[in-house]
């Protein structure tokens, strides 16, 4: 069974074709600059160098058409015809309260995804364009929607309701939704499998740390709490996002700087985080380099980032009533030896003991805890595409 996984952005598209017999990625690719001058596809067949396909792509339909043509191309293709593709799994960022699991796409589901546009105005329209383009080009192929928010729908009300007038929740569905759900679910399941513990009491804190970062508190495979909120702006300090702050700061800055709501939102989403503090970059690698070279603001940015992660870990340990495993994943979580060490330092009171030698790995599934550590510290590479493919396969079987 071959599953095509599609992740559509506003001007980009990532894809993978996975043979589910042995979970083998046959091909992966990235389409860039859709609807912009200089559009191109970087198409990478397993065991071969990447091929660059440079063609004009005015919209997502044309982009997907070229991707499908590349998949059956006699030189760099991997299937003889579209009939070999059993189903398509689409990443959808926001499923609101309606979708608490992955679903087969039909008219009712499409209407539900469109209703969530208000909650994810940057992402859901792009996801919808990808789905509609695929449906037009592959009308007989089953399609599945896998939602970033679905995994977090098991949170109890006390963890998702904001202390605002309740009517805003009733009228506008303003509440915590959380994101990166597919990644949190993948690594928590992998942790359970690695430690051979699938009990209803297995307590995991998953740290998805990248340019966008979030934590989740998970008990018995179900999400209890997560750090992102109504939008991906809440929670941890990120590449360019502020994370948690005093809400009264917003009107204060808006008055001082004469900013509109949109301009203020742009400051919080695009100019803040470690980029705002350091003034160096939004890329943690650049900031780590600058800090090593003696840049004090770069060092401060890293200190603030790690301190916030530690605070959340301790808070989630309290919510779960203890913790069995602490998982690091995504770009920083999988690859930054120094930041993992910095985050774990000071968590010894929780039973977290990181082994400095075992921690010297990048992007490899590793138990990096000391033998004496009560809490297992795991580094687990995330694989959202595989999770999407697994959900898709389960629904079309």
Curated annotation (Swiss-Prot):
Q: Write out the residues that bind substrate.
A: 91
Q: Which GO terms describe its cellular component?
A: cytoplasm
Q: What is its main location?
A: cytoplasm
Print the keywords alphabetically.
ATP-binding, Cytoplasm, Kinase, Magnesium, Metal-binding, Nucleotide-binding, Transferase
Co-factor binding details: Mg(2+). Can also accept Mn(2+).
User: What residues form the catalytic site here?
Assistant: 148
Example GO molecular function = magnesium ion binding
Q: Where is this site: Transition state stabilizer?
A: 180, 241
Coiled-coil residues are: none
GO BP annotations, alphabetical order: acetate metabolic process; acetyl-CoA biosynthetic process
Q: Which pathway does the database say it acts in?
A: Metabolic intermediate biosynthesis; acetyl-CoA biosynthesis; acetyl-CoA from acetate: step 1/2
Q: Record-annotated residues binding Mg(2+)? A: 7, 384
The residues the record assigns to binding ATP are: 14, 208-212, 283-285, 331-335
Q: Which reaction does it catalyse?
A: acetate + ATP = acetyl phosphate + ADP
Give the cofactors, semicolon-separated.
Mg(2+); Mn(2+)
Any keyword Acetylation? no
Q: What is its EC number?
A: 2.7.2.1
Supply the InterPro entries for this chain. Answer: Ac/propionate_kinase (IPR004372), Aliphatic_acid_kin_short-chain (IPR000890), Aliphatic_acid_kinase_CS (IPR023865), ATPase_NBD (IPR043129)
Answer yes or no on keyword Lipid biosynthesis.
no
Location in the cell reads:
Cytoplasm
* EC main group: transferase
Stated role: Catalyzes the formation of acetyl phosphate from acetate and ATP. Can also catalyze the reverse reaction.
Q: Subunit arrangement?
A: Homodimer.
What is the protein's name according to its record?
Answer: Acetate kinase
Species annotation: Treponema denticola (strain ATCC 35405 / DSM 14222 / CIP 103919 / JCM 8153 / KCTC 15104)
């Amino acid at each position: 069974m071959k599953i095509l996984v599609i992740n559509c952005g506003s001007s980009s598209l990532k894809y993978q074709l996975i043979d589910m017999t042995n979970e083998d990625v046959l091909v992966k690719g990235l389409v860039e600059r859709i609807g912009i001058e200089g559009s191109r596809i970087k198409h990478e067949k397993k065991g071969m160098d990447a091929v660059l396909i440079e063609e004009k792509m005015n919209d997502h339909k044309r982009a997907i058409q070229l991707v499908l043509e590349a998949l059956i191309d006699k030189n760099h293709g991997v299937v003889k015809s579209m009939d070999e593709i059993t189903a398509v799994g689409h990443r959808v960022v926001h499923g609101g309260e309606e979708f608490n699991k992955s679903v087969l796409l039909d008219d009712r589901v499409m209407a539900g995804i469109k209703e969530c546009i208000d909650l994810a105005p940057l992402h859901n329209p792009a996801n919808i364009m990808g789905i509609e383009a695929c449906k037009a080009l592959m009308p007989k192929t089953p399609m599945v929607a896998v939602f970033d928010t679905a995994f977090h729908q098991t949170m109890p009300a006390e963890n998702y309701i904001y202390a605002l007038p309740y009517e805003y929740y009733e009228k506008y569905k303003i509440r915590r939704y959380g994101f990166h759900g597919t990644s949190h679910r993948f690594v928590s399941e992998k942790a359970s499998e690695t430690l051979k513990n699938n009990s209803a009491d297995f307590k995991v804190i998953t740290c998805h740390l990248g340019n966008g970062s979030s934590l989740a508190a998970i008990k018995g495979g179900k999400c209890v709490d997560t750090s992102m909120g109504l939008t991906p702006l809440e929670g941890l300090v990120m590449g360019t996002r502020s994370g948690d702050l005093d809400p009264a700061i917003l009107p204060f800055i808006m008055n001082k700087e004469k900013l509109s709501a949109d301009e203020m939102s742009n400051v919080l989403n695009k100019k803040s985080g470690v980029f705002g503090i350091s003034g160096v970059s939004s890329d943690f690698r650049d900031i780590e380099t600058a800090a090593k070279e003696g840049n004090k603001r770069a060092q401060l940015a890293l200190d603030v980032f790690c301190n916030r992660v530690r605070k959340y870990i301790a808070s989630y340990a309290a919510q779960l009533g203890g913790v069995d495993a602490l998982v690091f994943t995504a770009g920083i979580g999988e690859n930054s030896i120094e930041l993992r060490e910095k985050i774990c330092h000071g968590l010894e009171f929780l039973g977290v003991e990181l082994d400095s030698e075992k921690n010297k790995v990048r992007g490899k599934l590793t138990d990096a805890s000391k033998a004496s550590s009560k809490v297992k510290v795991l580094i687990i590479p995330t694989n959202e595409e595989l999770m999407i493919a697994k959900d898709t396969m389960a629904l079309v079987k």
